[in-house]
């Protein structure tokens, strides 16, 4: 990361104001400004493992990754700079968590793109840290206030759940398909064969719905699930437990923390990172799959039909099949053969 996001560029217009501040950066941290801004001290807290990877290389233990921030994560900070995400419930979870830990009198800055809905920060924080807009540039807004009252934060109150064909799906703010099973995942599930056996890796597992639905019809599969999102990791663990399904769940930037090989890799890969369109994760998934598939193993992914994945699949595996499609989505299948590049 070297290029700054528009939100960071707005903050840099005020860089002189931050030189004496002990800052906690949090929210949608899509660049390394927290590591590079000239401050008295800087910490960062993120729920996104790939953002933590970048920041921790420069900030060490002052960059933290977890679902819920703790008092240690905000220690000695007198200023919060919060990058507004595109998901309002996610912002609510994170801000209530952070403001419950920071001392009264803390300076609060909220910055974000106008299209992300950053304006709603004013209403959200009205009872705790009344905000005023202090800058507007790069289609972003920057808001400032001072913490007057700490909210009471209870992470358990943010859990949600829904049912899919008799399965219980547990969700948290910021998890993909929080309110119900998305159409793409439904299409992918329709292609899975009952009584499948072997080791299955679910990359970008979200709330864990693909894995538990697969396990119900194929109870002998051995499941591993991973996601970059701390809320997704916790939601998947809860979904597995709620349906009495066993599996290993951990945070990983695609394959960064994955060990070993699998008989099948399934995924509904993201193509948005925050407000930005990004095909990086899916391309990393396709290219890296050959290092994590057994001979004869398969990669099966669902994607928006317009996305340019066939070329990457052919380049990596030598061929691919479309095994299901609608007007909007396609399910791609690629098999690990001698033709496949061995990574």
UniProtKB/Swiss-Prot annotation:
Give the CC-aspect GO terms: cytoplasm
What would be an example GO MF term here? 16S rRNA (guanine(1207)-N(2))-methyltransferase activity
Where would one find coiled-coil regions in this protein?
Answer: none
Q: Does the keyword rRNA processing apply?
A: yes
The keyword Transferase belongs to this UniProt entry's keyword annotation: yes
Q: Where in the cell is it found?
A: Cytoplasm
The record's EC number reads: 2.1.1.172
Superkingdom is: Bacteria
Q: Which reaction does it catalyse?
A: guanosine(1207) in 16S rRNA + S-adenosyl-L-methionine = N(2)-methylguanosine(1207) in 16S rRNA + S-adenosyl-L-homocysteine + H(+)
Q: Which InterPro entries match?
A: DNA_methylase_N6_adenine_CS (IPR002052), Mtase_sm_N (IPR013675), rRNA_ssu_MeTfrase_C (IPR023543), RsmC/RlmG (IPR046977), SAM-dependent_MTases_sf (IPR029063), Small_mtfrase_dom (IPR007848)
Q: Which Gene3D superfamilies is this protein grouped with?
A: Vaccinia Virus protein VP39
Its keywords, alphabetically, are: Cytoplasm, Methyltransferase, rRNA processing, S-adenosyl-L-methionine, Transferase
Description of how the protein assembles with itself and partners? Monomer.
Q: What does the sequence similarity comment in the record state about its family?
A: Belongs to the methyltransferase superfamily. RsmC family.
Free-text function comment from the UniProt entry? Specifically methylates the guanine in position 1207 of 16S rRNA in the 30S particle.
Protein name as it appears in the record: Ribosomal RNA small subunit methyltransferase C
Q: Which gene encodes it?
A: rsmC
